[in-house]
Amino acid sequence: MVPVEDLVYRYALLNAVKHRGRANPGAVMGAVMSNEPELRKMAPQVKEAVEAAVERVNSLSPEEQQQEMERLGLEITERKQKKRKGLRELAGVKGEVVLRFAPNPSGPLHIGHARAAILNHEYARKYDGRLILRIEDTDPRRVDPEAYDMIPADLEWLGVEWDETVIQSDRMETYYEYTEKLIERGGAYVCTCRPEEFRELKNRGEACHCRSLGFRENLQRWREMFEMKEGSAVVRVKTDLNHPNPAIRDWVSMRIVEAEHPRTGTRYRVYPMMNFSVAVDDHLLGVTHVLRGKDHLANREKQEYLYRHLGWEPPEFIHYGRLKMDDVALSTSGAREGILRGEYSGWDDPRLGTLRAIARRGIRPEAIRKLMVEIGVKIADSTMSWKKIYGLNRSILEEEARRYFFAADPVKLEVVGLPGPVRVERPLHPDHPEIGNRVLELRGEVYLPGDDLGEGPLRLIDAVNVIYSGGELRYHSEGIEEARELGASMIHWVPAESALEAEVIMPDASRVRGVIEADASELEVDDVVQLERFGFARLDSAGPGMVFYYAHK
């Protein structure tokens, strides 16, 4: 096996050669996590190796990077215009395709974000294009400082690779520059009207007195805004005052916010609204296609006014329907409040719809990706169910998850009359005998799952037949034929002498306590196993006292 450092170095080298000699740590980490699933459990170590590899590769000249490529036998595979099943073609492709995933850093990503992230990534791969991660943090009151690290980490888990990271709070001077250009072109004005007064005029389709002021006076007002109080002035983009949608009439592009920003402190007081910063960035960053929900249709109209004022060609806009999902908390603000109240244990509480909560339960990113590609970019609304996610995830886990006996709410019993010890070997995976076997030794006392324990004949799977009656477990016979004649119910079991304590955290955060067979001690954190006749679960803590998070049946 190639050492992690060497493997990561190759990914960094490929990324650098593909992108003008500069490797991006986020893109390299995403590529490693996506293509080398066995390394996911080593994410912290891999991240350190990635950072070191990127620094090493970026210190090389383009010629030296090419020499390294030849030495290692690496090649850039051309994938231009390669069709990928499940996604329709993009309209208006004229050259390099550039897309962006642009979350607000109010918290970690949830499964709703996964759709936009995956679709943009899939299209970037489909057309051998570029994907920009743009952190839209121009509302200082809605920024969670931890989100700057959580968002890239969530994308890495999802297997999304990006080529460039842009943080909008680093671009404030750019927004100021284009605000001035817009005012000079007569496309915007500074409005000092009281909000309720302007609303009445807007609803009647009438202009306020600020709209008719010349650009010189508006430029003076603009410069004075930096000393004004919050709420005393805004910049408005001129649109059609008779537009059928009042929300589009002379929309606000800049406003005063007297709040400290987690990254820039009190350096700035005038911040762009989303529609302004998004349109400016999409143009300046060369974004060719914008994928987003149909709830942004009105925003598209707003931004098109800005494009016309500045003489810019708008990107191709592709809108898709809403994604509905029942029985999951997707509200970031609601989740934060619940965490602060102690209702949730954190962003990875199993009741939440965050990607880190889903990952903690053992749901694989490949299952989420497959679902999002299946849903695609259709304009009709879609309903996403846990049942569908579980089905896709099960098809992945069935092939790789090791099997173990787990007795939930266990009852400890002695097998009365057992003639002698019974040694049982069962495969760790029924379809992959090469993985090896696990060994259970029945010596007398066993744990049986409380919910499955009923009076009558039972067969301890692969071991012996017993009769359970009046709280006593009595040996009957050993063969499977006798079990069939008895009509015995199959029941899994854990030898009492070697049992390990374990508990499973369920999706509703309830806890199921039990015991697991001794061979499970070989498991490592992040391993996903099948607890036979109970369900798939991910090992979250190795002990003492193993803790699993339940995925699904």
From Swiss-Prot:
Coiled coil: none annotated. Keywords: Aminoacyl-tRNA synthetase, ATP-binding, Cytoplasm, Ligase, Nucleotide-binding, Protein biosynthesis. GO terms for cellular component: cytosol; protein-containing complex. It is found in: Cytoplasm. One of its GO terms (biological process) is glutamyl-tRNA aminoacylation. It catalyses: tRNA(Glu) + L-glutamate + ATP = L-glutamyl-tRNA(Glu) + AMP + diphosphate. GO terms for molecular function: ATP binding; glutamate-tRNA ligase activity. SUPFAM superfamilies: Nucleotidylyl transferase, Ribosomal protein L25-like. The keyword Protein biosynthesis applies. PROSITE patterns: AA_TRNA_LIGASE_I. The keyword Metal-binding does not apply. Gene3D superfamilies: 2.40.240.100, HUPs (3.40.50.620), Ribosomal Protein L25, Chain P (2.40.240.10). Disulfide bonds: none annotated. It comes from the Archaea. NCBIfam families: gltX_arch (TIGR00463), PRK04156.1 (NF003169). Catalyzes the attachment of glutamate to tRNA(Glu) in a two-step reaction: glutamate is first activated by ATP to form Glu-AMP and then transferred to the acceptor end of tRNA(Glu). HAMAP family: Glu_tRNA_synth_type2. This is Glutamate--tRNA ligase. The gene is gltX.
